[in-house]
């Protein structure tokens, strides 16, 4: 790390932009929103919409008994409000940007506080850690805890080391074996009659999202030796899946929606059986 390339940190107060520039990449933050809005590597834009904390999933058939409290608290429409934003040079070739947000639905009390720390290295690597603090004691079990971002649609190929090739969740994964898998983003979508949460891959240690030439983003769990994460990559948002009643109603976006979950709630079988076990609830 001591041999990292130098980084330039520039702030345009008039445009409310903080930029971190390396030898072949630029990362931009909106200082009013406290969000990463651009990540350009070798002239290629990797971000279509800023990464944000995400706590909602499109309800499955098994979620019909818990979806009401999810929506009562507005988990499907949470918006971040910036509380604090700062940038610091940790050492030569290493810059850390920290943003504190509170998430709430419109005209509702704040539900969750997040502290996101982006550590940017001179070689182009970015380390993201997010701390979550609930602000309401009465919160229902959450569907997921993670980050969601949109990337350009050209990045439509997925390769991962984790459970596959079929979808897997904390309590539904025995038939999905650990290995290396490749498929298109379109092929990760499970076309249930009623659109809903689908296509997750549990216990993932690393996954790459690339274009036809193999250029893209590699996501790695820092705790890969001990625990993985769950991810989905779709051409639909959770809200689109929730609102559609049948598959033909879905119109694919031109971008790829990526969800990376530290934890994903269990699926259970509560459409006609028991809800998820306590150990699979968040």
Feature-to-residue mapping (PLM):
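Beta-strand/loop-rich accessory regions of lumenal/periplasmic or secreted enzymes
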Residues: 2-282
